Curated annotation (Swiss-Prot):
A lipid is attached at residue 20 (S-diacylglycerol cysteine). It comes from Staphylococcus aureus (strain bovine RF122 / ET3-1). Keywords: Cell membrane, Electron transport, Lipoprotein, Membrane, Oxidoreductase, Palmitate, Respiratory chain, Signal, Transmembrane, Transmembrane helix, Transport. This is Probable quinol oxidase subunit 2. A lipid is attached at residue 20 (N-palmitoyl cysteine).
Length: 366
């Protein structure tokens, strides 16, 4: 009995200790995360109420209708009222859970309401790192992100190698970043602070280290930070290509200029393989390669010249989509944004056509 009490005490202690952890999705710091928090709590409470009612009725029926010697065997007969109740109640339950869920999910696709114009950040995943290009400011960061408080941020998500998932739990849910396309995801920080971001989609041995730090600051501090970064080293193609290698250590870096001056990852998904070639990097299976041999042949300096911007995405050529290159001395203006928007519309059309074709192939509806 004492052993049972010890195990019970240990189990109870573990439950209490779990309450000391910082559950980030319940510590919302933005409007999108707040709506997600409400939806999660609403669903949990709603389902707990259902469980308590069902278990309570179960206990009552067991007690009231338990078998005894004087019990008369039950008689089955039709009861329209009861049958209507147990048919209608599940429909109400499903509707009560589905309506707010669907509404919230569709709301996520719309930018949070704000009096301030949204800013744009290109978030690119590659080499188990995150690259953040600020086209308006012409600066770029690696594994660190700084944004102003109370201003929507439109993240244009791209991947240069494996598919990843961009996630800042305290600001909102995750969204996938895929090769050969650009996905938009709008988030906003309603408070200043430092938050954690990560790739939430398992994509290989470096998955655990593909994280980044998010600094939400006042607009004044943000402007000051931008000015400081503009005074740092300009990002050149050799430096960027070296950072694309999984063998390059994950560090928080800041640069003047962006990779948008020499590559459009969505239009040129083959770019990263040329970067590998420049530094003699070869992907190896970590299960069959010793740690010291994983990256031993990688060159410190590029062995061949950098490649010019080009289109290797067949969809771009087929649909007349433009290569989006923004020089460090070129403005991120309406003309550039118009081409961005056109590419995005074509990409949505391609995605819809692919879904329709898949439905036709599998006998599904539209």
């Amino acid at each position: 009995m004492s052993k049972f009490k010890s195990l019970l005490l240990l189990f109870g202690t573990l439950i209490l200790l779990s309450g000391c952890s910082n559950i980030e999705i319940f510590n919302a710091k933005g409007p999108v995360a707040s709506s997600q928090k409400f939806l999660i709590l609403y669903s949990i409470v709603f389902m707990l109420v259902i469980c308590f009612v069902v278990l309570g009725m179960f206990a009552i029926f067991i007690y009231k209708y338990s078998y005894n010697k004087n019990a008369e065997s039950g008689k089955m007969h039709h009861n329209a009222i009861i049958e209507t109740i147990w048919f209608v109640i599940p429909i109400i339950i499903v509707a009560a859970l589905a309506i707010p869920t669907v509404k919230t999910l569709y709301d996520y696709e719309k930018p949070p309401k704000s009096e301030k114009d949204p800013m744009v950040v290109y978030a690119v995943s590659a080499g188990y790192k995150w690259f953040f290009a600020y086209p308006d400011e012409h600066i770029e960061t690696v594994n660190t992100l700084t944004i102003p408080k109370d201003r929507p941020v439109v993240f244009k998500l791209q991947a240069m190698d494996t598919m990843t998932s961009f996630w800042i739990p305290q600001l909102g849910g995750q969204k996938y970043a895929m090769t050969g396309m650009t996905m938009n995801w709008t988030l906003e920080a309603s408070q200043t602070g430092t938050f954690r971001g990560r790739n939430s989609n398992f994509n290989g041995e470096g998955f655990s280290r593909q994280t980044f730090k998010v600094n939400a600051v006042s607009q004044k501090d943000y402007d000051k930070w931008v000015k400081e970064v503009k005074g740092k080293k300009t990002l050149d193609q050799d430096t960027f290509d070296k950072q694309l290698l999984p063998s390059t250590p994950n560090k928080a870096l800041e640069f003047n200029g962006t990779h948008m001056a020499f590559v459009d990852p969505a239009a040129d998904p083959e770019y990263i393989f040329y970067a590998y070639k420049r530094f003699n990097f070869e992907l190896k299976d970590p299960n069959f390669t010793s740690e010291e041999n994983m990256f031993k042949d990688v060159s410190e300096k590029p062995l061949i010249p950098a490649r010019k911007a080009q289109i290797t995405n067949a969809n771009y050529k087929r649909h007349g989509m433009k290569l989006m290159i923004l020089g460090n001395d070129e403005p991120y203006n309406n003309e550039f944004k118009k081409d961005e928007s056109k590419n995005a519309k074509e990409m949505k059309k391609i995605s819809k056509d692919a879904q329709d074709q898949d439905n036709d192939d599998h006998g599904g509806g539209h």
